[in-house]
């Protein structure tokens, strides 16, 4: 029996709907004349716009074939109306060619390389073939090809600048090609003035017979007009174009036929039906048609005239202005109302790229003033009813919500909760106005969409500008409330950097269920409690919440049952069950402490299994004299929670505030989840607001009123300080002042006086803090960290202190004094800006003036800084936006280049780091938790040191079978466990077994560590580039622009803050304060350090010479130099008369022979051979030059300072270590100086380090320098972000700055570069070179409206859920 074959097709015979097409890539090109004509629908030549009946002229600029000219018209090409017709092109034929100003530099570069008669390349044949072979290499990147083409142009232009180049094909003499001067318009000149001998006459004769002679500037320099250049370009071979990296024929770079853009991008606006207002582009095109018509008329005449050239130049300028209205060469024709060109529409902040494509205005948004509301949850935002009635959400009708939506429809748009519109499945819609609402509601069917008012629980996005980091826009749930402001919990102020002094915020309503889901998952407040900058918590309690917590948890706060129960009820919504803890005092009455309130807040009842264990040192922590037990702190500053019970401590900012990884909310988040932390924040906000409202807390003038004792103490301190200052001033005037290292007398005096005056303020501040009552409101706020510091209090109560301008005392702005109220040359504290009064006692007129000087500096600094940091952040974002982590753990950019094999060397997520300095876990705290939750039991075994190590290795193998943990993490964990072994082996613990480690504790500890480490791995698709850029850019706004004193060296000011960050990321070659930190081979001996300093520091002859004088007698004339041996010995300099002689002979400016200099015992005699008549002049000139000759050290080094090494970890047997700080450059020479340890010597100049030590050393320098700057400003940024930035700057083998030239070399796409800076240059360059943009990066995807390939967009492959159809070809063959 024959088996019937069954065939099932893998593909369907046809597909009805393929879905919308996506743009895969963009190919940039230059259109030829034929392509322009093919693309156009109509030829434009008519100068008129409308006829007398206001109908557009045919073949005019408003021809209806190019699209409807206004809203009432119809397109005659596609029959579309104003909304539907995309527009159609026209074309304008020019009678004479003109330069395309966008490609002007390309045209110039081509002309530099070709013969001006036969179009042959001027390059040597061997060089030509070599460069062409490189250019044809398929593996060569477009960036390298551009560089190669530039090298060819540079070679040809260099040859032309040195000599006349003779063409090897036709023998024509080619000179330099350059742009003509701006006053002559737009053109190119050919300069052949370097022709020599008999060639000149021949050349002049040849030029006199050419047409170009009329435009000649001089006989050997003539203008290459576009017609001539067009002919040259047409004769060029394709090989030559390939060598110059021009993808299309070069004649296309010259305009002979122009595209006229469609009317949709240059609409005509009718005003009152009697006149029209035309677009700038239409006005420009009208001028071009007018000029072309004049040119046509002139050319049609039998004889040519100079007028021909003038009209041609006019057309050239008009075409150039049409493309770019800011083009050079048009200054001689100023315009009353400047019209913008095509390029002006694209470039800048208001251009198409940045204003309409990269970002755009959106609907369904609201904006109003913000207010605080502690009764709202941190995940909620209070929205005014008025706003909720305007903003809508399209809800689809289903059987679950039909009745609710019917009621909304009945209510209509003006009654809340209502609806504004109903959309039906057939595409029609009805607006809910009038009396038809009831009928529409009754007819409402499943499948309809109702645009209903915003309701409680709807998902909204909340944003405050400036949006400096990811947490500046987060997702909240709507809570509809009366009044007119947006409200939210104050705990969420930090991420938005919001305050309530009139700030406004924006709100966006996502319009699809997918968008809502994505928003609540990725952008929800509870999922963004920590900042990815360094893993610190950002959403935390602030101000009043901290004050009330501090007061509630005082040792002397007690509550009876009624009061305690009432306070506990403040926390929740009255729905939570609360288990009252055992009272602290039972007799004579049951009393509970304030600390127990926080135990209830953390764990209201037994069903909530939250067990928090933590130790925190608060601001007012003071170590006891014996230092045995921290919990016995006299100020109750040691906060200790054990299993969610507060044992000791007054809670303040360190425990409840932001910026602490060991705070209460951080631990709730890490040990449990974000919900546990959010719930505790909500409870504390409600409790604090209600408690402080009833308890009362205010600040008044009597809080800053000093007592009699304090006033006397302050007066004595100030008088004592003034006396010290006057003594120092007298010492300075007598010349007896002891100088400080590296400083002269005046600077030493300033340093001394500043130190004394700072001591006055500190002394008065201490007296003030100790003299205030503990109930003093400013003191309470300072201690708990809610607002202010001891300095603020001491300025209000005791003494304002020294006012500084640019880090110095008040300068002498008047004649030899700061103000006319003081004597001349006065250095006294009062004359130089010291304010002895407090804000309470009031400032005198002069003190007030000095105080405003200091205040002005702060204001100016802030204003300048805002623009500087904003631009810095934008550059960082553009450079790093494409970087993401892939599934193979590598960090790559949009084009697939690997920047890091593992993100941050360990693949950890910075937002989840628990330890200091980016460590994944805090082992001490974790072990404390394990000890609390897993106490020793009778069946547990205590481990000795050896058993501990052995058990650890076993547990590690058991829990980390897949080897997820890195070697560095395992090493740090092993070190911690070994330290536990040392502790448990000490005698007291062995005796009592109180701090011993049991087997169960170790097992649980290792398990938790491995599990948590695994959880902290960064997810594939994370946009780490964007996060890194924001993490570096956002702290920049908090920095100052001032310079700081270098670490430990008062005399050495180095650039810090925003200017220093800019220097680093710009990869500046010449930084403002280059410093080399040089380690010594013998760091313990100061004499040795001074000797090495003498070898490095630049020393001039004038510094070590006792005298330099001219000796003239009747028989001889010479210059005698006497060296000062005392100075040479004190400075440990190795300078001798012989070494001075060699230095003089090596100086290029002084032309002396060996015989002219005679060495004496203590100096030299210089007798130059000169003409007697000029001897006097020459010797005095030599005398003036000699003091500046460098006789010792490195010439690029300005100064060397010997300083104490402040790093205590490097000290040997407690002895002081010395090092050198070298102010200047030439790292290589410093490293090679005898006595310097070159292996540990570093520089802060990134480019110099790169040249001296290589690219890896430069990468390390970038990381270290950014870390140092941030550290000096008290900011911590995860090192992984800095490593990523350093890798981006160095991954191509050279240090690339994060600015326009550096980003250009970073293999970025055309659209990205065009959206950054120099829009026109990048687009024209891409077109000339025929570049292809593959739409891979973030900017390109946003511009094209395509999902970007990061985050969820990284997924490319999906698992098939259906089985593939099987192909049945009958039974298997029987093989015999």
Curated annotation (Swiss-Prot):
Sequence positions that bind Zn(2+) 2: 115, 118, 170
Domain of life, source organism: Eukaryota
Annotated binding of Zn(2+) 1, by residue: 75, 78, 85, 88
Enzymatic reactions: RNA(n) + a ribonucleoside 5'-triphosphate = RNA(n+1) + diphosphate
Alphabetical keyword list: DNA-directed RNA polymerase, Magnesium, Metal-binding, Nucleotidyltransferase, Nucleus, Transcription, Transferase, Zinc
Function: DNA-dependent RNA polymerase catalyzes the transcription of DNA into RNA using the four ribonucleoside triphosphates as substrates. Largest and catalytic core component of RNA polymerase III which synthesizes small RNAs, such as 5S rRNA and tRNAs. Forms the polymerase active center together with the second largest subunit. A single-stranded DNA template strand of the promoter is positioned within the central active site cleft of Pol III.
Family membership: Belongs to the RNA polymerase beta' chain family.
PANTHER family: DNA-DIRECTED RNA POLYMERASE SUBUNIT BETA' N-TERMINAL SECTION (PTHR48446:SF1)
The protein's assembly and partners: Component of the RNA polymerase III (Pol III) complex consisting of 17 subunits.
Protein's name in the database: DNA-directed RNA polymerase III subunit 1
Gene, per the UniProt record: NRPC1
